[in-house]
Swiss-Prot record:
Disulfide partners: none
Enzyme class: transferase
Parts of the chain that traverse the membrane: 23-43, 71-91, 107-127, 133-153, 189-209, 217-237, 247-267
Keywords assigned by UniProt, alphabetized: Cell inner membrane, Cell membrane, Membrane, Transferase, Transmembrane, Transmembrane helix
Cell location: Cell inner membrane
Function: Catalyzes the transfer of the diacylglyceryl group from phosphatidylglycerol to the sulfhydryl group of the N-terminal cysteine of a prolipoprotein, the first step in the formation of mature lipoproteins.
GO biological process: lipoprotein biosynthetic process
Protein name: Phosphatidylglycerol--prolipoprotein diacylglyceryl transferase
InterPro entries, alphabetized: Lgt
Gene Ontology molecular-function annotations: phosphatidylglycerol-prolipoprotein diacylglyceryl transferase activity
Record membrane topology: Multi-pass membrane protein
Species of the source: Brucella anthropi (strain ATCC 49188 / DSM 6882 / CCUG 24695 / JCM 21032 / LMG 3331 / NBRC 15819 / NCTC 12168 / Alc 37)
C-alpha cells in the first residue's frame, strides 16, 4: 500500500549539475567549494572573534588575528587527510585494504566528518603548541565558525544526490536519481539545518550573548555536543552506508556509534570549562 501512495506525494529531484564550471580539464564541484567556503568562513570569523577583545577572559585574546592566516593550510590538511583516512577506517576498510591505490582518490568521493574533526583537532594542537597558544582557546576560536562549512557541504551532498535518507511518505520526500524507485528523506538538508543553521545560531548566542569564550573549552565542547546530538537525530532518517548497513537491531548505525563519544566528550569539555573558570574566579 505504501508503495502506491509514495509516488503521488513526493518531490522531483532538482536537476543541478554537481560541477559548477570547467576550465579545460579542471572541474570545480559544489562539494569542493563547500570545503573551501567552510575553511575560509572559519578563518574570517575566527579573526573577527580575536579582534573583539571583550569576548575573552581578561579582555585578552589568546593570539593575534594574523596567526589564523598561517593556520589555514594546517586546517585544510587536517580536514582533507583526516576526513579521507576516517572514511577509509570507519566506513569501507575492507575495500581500501584490498585497493590501497584508491585511498588518495578523494575526487571519487568518500569523506568522514568524524575523521575530519580528528584531523583538524590534531592540526590545532600541533599549531597551538608550536606558537605558544592555549590549546582550548584555539579549539574555541575555530569551532565557533565550523557549522557554516558543515551546512554548505551538506547542501553539496544533496546536489550530488549522495548520503540520502530512508524511504519515506512525507510530503517533502524526494526522488533521488540513484536512490531507487521510491522517494526518500532529504536527510542531507536535515543535517544542513541542524548542523549548520541551528548549531551556528546556538554558538553565536553563547559567544556574543553568553560570553562563553571567557571559559576556554566551553564553545568547543558545545560545538562537539551539538554536532553529535544533531547527527544522532538525523541518523534515524538517513540511509546507512550500503557496505555497512545497520550495526544492531535495524536502527544502530556507524554514524551513531561515532557520535555518542562526541556528545560525552563535549559535555565533559563544558563541565571542565565551567569548573576551571570557577577556580580562577
Amino acid at each position: 500500500m505504501i508503495e502506491t501512495l509514495l509516488p503521488a506525494s513526493a518531490l522531483a529531484f532538482p536537476n543541478i549539475d554537481p560541477v559548477i564550471f570547467r576550465v579545460g580539464p579542471l572541474a570545480v564541484h559544489w562539494y569542493g567549494l563547500g570545503y573551501v567556503v567552510g575553511i575560509m568562513f572559519a578563518w574570517w570569523y575566527g579573526k573577527k572573534l580575536l579582534r573583539s577583545h571583550r569576548l575573552w577572559a581578561n579582555n585578552q585574546p589568546p593570539m593575534a588575528p594574523e596567526a589564523l592566516d598561517d593556520f589555514v593550510i594546517w586546517a585544510a590538511l587536517g580536514v582533507v587527510l583526516g576526513g579521507r583516512i576516517g572514511y577509509v577506517l570507519f566506513y569501507n576498510f575492507s575495500y581500501y585494504i584490498s585497493n590501497p591505490l584508491a585511498i588518495p582518490a578523494v575526487w571519487d568521493g568518500g569523506m568522514s566528518f568524524h575523521g575530519g574533526i580528528l584531523g583538524t583537532t590534531l592540526a590545532m594542537i600541533l599549531f597551538a603548541r608550536s606558537r605558544g597558544i592555549k590549546v582550548w582557546s584555539m579549539f574555541d576560536t575555530i569551532a565557533a565558525g565550523v557549522p557554516v562549512g558543515l551546512g554548505v557541504v551538506r547542501v553539496a551532498n544533496f546536489i550530488n544526490s549522495e548520503l540520502w535518507g530512508r524511504v519515506s511518505d512525507v510530503p517533502w520526500a524526494v526522488y533521488f536519481p540513484n536512490g531507487g524507485p521510491l522517494p526518500r528523506h532529504p536527510s542531507q538538508l536535515y543535517e544542513a539545518f541542524l548542523e549548520g543553521v541551528v548549531l551556528f545560531f546556538v554558538l553565536f548566542l553563547l559567544v556574543w550573548v553568553g560570553r562563553k569564550l571567557k571559559k576556554p573549552g566551553f564553545i568547543a565542547g558545545a560545538f562537539v555536543t551539538g554536532y553529535g546530538l544533531s547527527r544522532i537525530v538525523v541518523e534515524f532518517f538517513r540511509e546507512p552506508d550500503a557496505q555497512l548497513g545497520y550495526l544492531f537491531g535495524g536502527w544502530l548505525t556507524m554514524g551513531m556509534v561515532l557520535s555518542v563519544p562526541m556528545v560525552l566528550i563535549g559535555l565533559w569539555a563544558m563541565w571542565r570549562a565551567n569548573r576551571t573558570a570557577a577556580k580562577d574566579a
